[in-house]
Structures are given as C-alpha cells and as structure tokens.
C-alpha cells in the first residue's frame, strides 16, 4: 500500500489477528471466570478496534470504560511524557480491571496508567496488549496477555495510526518511509 512519502507493508494479517483475539478472549475468560465485576478499560485511541473485537470474545459479563493517555502526539516515537487526556467515567475501586492497550513500546504510557489505576484500589488489575515491542522497553512493565511480539518497526492498522491515518486497515502493517525527509 503506497502513500505519499511512505509504503505500508503487511506484517500481521487480519486472519491472524482474528485468531489471536479469539485465543486471548478464551484465556481472559478463564482468568476472570469467577468475577461478576469485570471492567475492561480501553486506552484510546489506538485500542478501540482491538477492544471491540476482544470484548466479544470474553465470556464473562463486563463493563467497558475508556481512558485516553498519550506519549506520542503526531510523532512516530514516544515523547516519554505521558499525558492523561480523558479519564474514566466509572469507579473501579473494588472491581476486577482489565486494561487493554494497543501497543507497549517504551512502557512509559502503560506504566503510568497502571500506577494511576492501582491508586484507585481495584480488587485486581491486569493488562492485555495487542502488540509488544520488548526491544524498545525503557520501563520494566509487561502485559499478562500479548497478541503479538513485534520488532522495532513503526506499525499502523487495526486501530494504530500514523498522524491519525490508517487506523481502519484490517491488518497491521509496517511503515517504510520512501521520502528521505521523513
């Protein structure tokens, strides 16, 4: 897929994503089988496609809430400064919480979010990330569930964007810049 100044090459197919999301849903269902108080927290904006698919595969009743935190802006690399742009609407104290993230890169965003949510005294808190880039990690953080471990490449699709574009791609692709100015 060619764009002005860059090309998107498919890395993970829509079929592979669907199969992995189904498996993650089964694993999460098993882990939370004894709860009736699960709150699934999606980190906006990148996780919205993943969370929509994932909650349909989770076999326990759940509420969905969203939090928007960012360390990217319009850049392709993390700025390391985490800003909360939209907080949860509901209360998570005493609840089982599953935080759903699109990608764990340096770890700064998810670490800050998990710290902030733990301070609200949930009964239990776990994290599920669609993608993990362990080679970029600067903060010691790990999701309990991960869809795919990927190399240090800039990716788009399945909710992930480049300057707010390409979230609608059904696959995950790598961005290869063809313009030396980028």
UniProtKB/Swiss-Prot annotation:
Transmembrane segments: none
Compartments, as annotated in UniProt: Cytoplasm
Protein keywords: Cytoplasm, Glycosyltransferase, Magnesium, Metal-binding, Nucleotide-binding, Purine salvage, Transferase
Record-listed GMP binding positions: 133, 154-155, 161
Principal subcellular localisation of the protein: cytoplasm
GO MF term (any one): magnesium ion binding
Cystine connections: none
The keyword Metal-binding is annotated on this UniProt entry: yes
UniProt GO cellular component terms: cytosol
PANTHER family: HYPOXANTHINE PHOSPHORIBOSYLTRANSFERASE (PTHR43340:SF1), HYPOXANTHINE-GUANINE PHOSPHORIBOSYLTRANSFERASE (PTHR43340)
Protein name, as recorded: Hypoxanthine-guanine phosphoribosyltransferase
Organism: Rhodobacter capsulatus (strain ATCC BAA-309 / NBRC 16581 / SB1003)
């Amino acid at each position: 897929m060619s764009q002005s100044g860059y090309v998107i090459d498919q890395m993970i197919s829509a079929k592979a994503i669907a199969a992995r999301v189904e498996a993650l849903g089964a694993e999460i269902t098993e882990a939370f089988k004894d709860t009736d108080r699960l709150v699934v927290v999606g980190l906006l904006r990148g996780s919205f496609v993943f969370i929509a698919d994932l909650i349909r595969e989770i076999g326990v009743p759940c509420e969905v809430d969203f939090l928007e935190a960012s360390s990217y802006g319009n850049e392709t690399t993390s700025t390391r400064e985490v800003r909360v742009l939209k907080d949860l609407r509901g209360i998570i104290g005493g609840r089982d919480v599953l935080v759903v993230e699109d990608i764990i890169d340096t770890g700064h965003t998810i670490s800050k979010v998990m710290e902030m949510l733990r301070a609200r005294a949930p009964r239990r808190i776990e994290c599920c990330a669609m993608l993990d880039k362990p080679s970029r990690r600067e903060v010691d953080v790990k999701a309990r569930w991960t869809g795919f471990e990927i190399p240090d490449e800039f990716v788009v699709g399945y909710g992930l964007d480049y300057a707010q574009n390409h979230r609608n791609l059904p696959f995950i692709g790598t961005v290869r810049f063809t313009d030396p100015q980028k």
